[in-house]
């Protein structure tokens, strides 16, 4: 098979600022892929967070790896060899920056020659630190990846994201790399806390595949459907950088 026909895409969350809901985005993206008829190879590179809500907590099929072990990011490429899935979805942990930067500097061009494309997902709230984390990753990754930016309202419905829109360096980033930008709805705090406590996905609640009385309430099923639809609409808009 000629290298140019490999056609694989590796999607990974930027492991910068913690607590911005990057794992929730990855979990919902996996559900979106299922709707497209794709079952992505799943990598959990945030094993230090496994007891508190890493990818494998919600999606047990995710393979765990220690990002700080030498050669771990080569699993991006190993996963491209496994099975028939054209997509690899990896959730990175906080503090993943240096290892990722070094790997891309050494391997990204070669991977691209083999037909492997990359998409980096940056999730930000309306906090300067989470915005700066995205910009820091872009400084290192440059145009070796496509960018999907998720503006997470967190607990601020209809947030205007002034830190994102008013930061001059963000405007430079947008001009240089033309990222896809989408929004993530603010979630009711009790709903989100129980979602994480019980390691459930929006898909499970929306489809009624839960036993807990709290999540069988109609109001919470409606919430799950609404939150998921907003995310899916954003993924639909970005499908050209999410599919091979």
Residue map of PLM features:
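Walker A (P-loop) phosphate-binding loop of P-loop NTPases
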Residues: 16-19
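Conserved catalytic-core segment of NTP-binding enzymes
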Residues: 95-194
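Nucleotide-state-sensitive switch-loop elements of NTP-binding domains
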Residues: 3-12, 26, 35-100, 117
């Amino acid at each position: 098979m000629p290298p140019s026909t490999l056609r694989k895409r590796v999607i990974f969350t930027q492991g910068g600022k913690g607590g911005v809901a990057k794992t929730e985005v990855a979990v919902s993206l996996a559900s979106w892929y299922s709707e497209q008829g794709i079952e992505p190879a799943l990598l959990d590179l945030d094993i230090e967070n496994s007891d508190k809500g890493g990818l494998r907590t919600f999606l047990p099929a995710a393979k765990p790896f220690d990002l700080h072990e030498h050669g771990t990011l080569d699993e991006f490429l190993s996963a491209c060899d496994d099975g028939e899935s054209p997509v690899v979805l990896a959730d990175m942990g906080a503090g993943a920056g240096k290892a990722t930067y070094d790997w891309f500097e050494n391997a990204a061009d070669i991977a691209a020659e083999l037909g492997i494309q990359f998409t980096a997902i940056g999730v930000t709230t309306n906090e300067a630190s989470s915005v700066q984390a995205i910009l820091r990753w872009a400084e290192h990754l440059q145009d070796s990846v496509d960018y999907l930016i998720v503006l997470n309202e967190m607990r601020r419905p209809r947030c205007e994201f002034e830190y994102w829109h008013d930061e001059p360096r963000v405007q430079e980033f947008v001009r240089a790399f033309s990222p896809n930008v989408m929004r993530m709805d603010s979630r009711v705090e009790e709903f989100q806390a129980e979602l994480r406590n019980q390691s459930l996905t929006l898909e499970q609640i929306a489809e009624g595949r839960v036993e807990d009385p709290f999540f069988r309430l109609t109001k919470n099923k409606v919430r799950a459907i609404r939150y998921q639809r907003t995310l899916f609409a954003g993924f639909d808009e970005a499908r050209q950088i999410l599919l091979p």
